[in-house]
Design a protein with these regions (language model features):
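Beta-strand-loop-alpha-helix segment that lines the small-molecule cofactor/substrate pocket
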Residues: 58, 62-69, 74-122, 137
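C-terminal helix-rich "cap/oligomerization" subdomain common to oxidoreductases
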Residues: 1-3, 63-66, 220, 297-341
Length: 341
């Protein structure tokens, strides 16, 4: 089998991490870039297009990597499914809303083409290390998890303009764009929650959506997880965007602490100090090279038949939880997660 041919749709800010990662993965031939701004597509050094349909016809990729805003996803997925692709990867937030995401997932399932959502935080090396400890029972029975989001990029009239200016116009922001990462990560670590409670705030008046809030997740066995997010505030790290914050995973037998440099320490119950079980590294890519880790995972699935994480139909559970969060913020009460997807 020859190298798998990959084409990327989108060449905006975050797309750079996708292109860089694909270029480092063996068994991959990165062949084309599509963007409405042809100059951005050309800047990648690949065959450049401003028309996805033409690219699919001329380049004939095996994998299409969609790195565009949510309102474009459904039409691009539909176009890709009409060509002879072996897999589609789609960035999050996935589609405009849950209904559109369901329709996209159904189309891919009917076509027999894997549609994998590029939700990469669960692939960050510190969460993989934490998951291994939990699976091995290293901190006993987990009772609670806390993540404090503190990227420090949300203050003032110029917030987000240097990287992703469309953030300012999103009517649903903190949860839909950012906290959704931890909705999926909490699912990865603890399974699907049964209900949620949310208190959301908009602190920066120049943006349309919420930029701070608390989200409490509950499981039937009395486990709890707390997402405590505030994009105005920072945390003690040289790069506040490495982990985006700090976490505690607490169990009856010990506590795991995630620091802002990506290191994870384990303190056994009753001990005064902990031991670093996952050290910080000088990761070159975003978030501990999680983009590359996800892409490598997809390649392994296509070549070796390894099961895919983040298949679109499974990821719909994340969107259902997100909807419950917004319902809770509006009702100011606990909201059940329906589990109907």
């Amino acid at each position: 089998m020859g190298d798998l041919r990959v084409a990327c749709i989108g060449a905006g800010y975050f797309a750079q991490f996708h292109y860089q990662a694909w270029a480092q993965i063996s068994g991959v031939d990165l062949i084309a870039s599509v963007d409405m701004d042809m100059s951005k597509a050309r800047a990648t050094g690949l065959a450049a297009y401003d028309n996805t349909e033409v690219m699919l016809r001329d380049a004939a990729p095996d994998i299409v990597d969609i790195i565009t805003p949510p309102q474009t996803h459904f039409d691009l997925i539909k176009l890709a499914l009409q060509s002879d692709v072996r897999a589609i990867i789609c960035q999050k937030p996935f589609c405009r809303d849950l209904d559109e995401a369901r329709r996209a997932a159904d189309l891919a399932r009917s076509a027999g083409v894997p549609l994998i959502i590029h939700e990469n935080f669960r692939f960050q090396p510190w969460y993989r290390a934490i998951k291994q400890v939990l699976d091995e029972g290293g901190i006993g029975a987990v009772q609670q998890v806390t993540f404090r989001l503190r990227p420090g990029d949300g203050q003032g009239a110029t917030a987000y303009l240097d990287r992703q200016p469309y953030f300012q116009k999103m009517k649903r922001f903190l949860v839909h764009e950012t906290a959704v990462h931890w909705i999926d990560t909490f699912r990865y670590l603890l399974g699907d929650p049964a209900s949620v409670f949310a208190d959301l705030r908009r602190l920066n008046p120049v943006i349309a959506g919420e930029d701070a809030g608390y989200i409490l997740f509950a499981w039937p066995d009395e486990r709890r997880a707390l997402f405590d997010g505030n994009r105005h505030l920072d945390h003690g790290a040289k790069n506040t965007r490495c982990t985006m914050g700090e976490a505690l995973i607490e169990g009856t037998g010990g506590t795991l602490t995630l620091a802002g440099d990506g290191s994870v320490a384990l303190r056994k119950f009753g001990a005064a100090a902990g031991t670093v079980i996952h050290g910080a590294e000088d990761w070159q890519g975003f978030g501990g090279d999680c983009v590359k880790a996800l892409q490598t995972h997809v390649i392994a699935g296509l070549i070796d038949g390894a099961p895919f994480e983040n298949m679109a139909h499974e990821y719909l559970h994340v969107l259902e939880i997100e909807e419950a969060v917004y319902r809770s913020a509006a009702s100011k009460s606990w909201e059940p997660v329906s589990g109907t997807v």
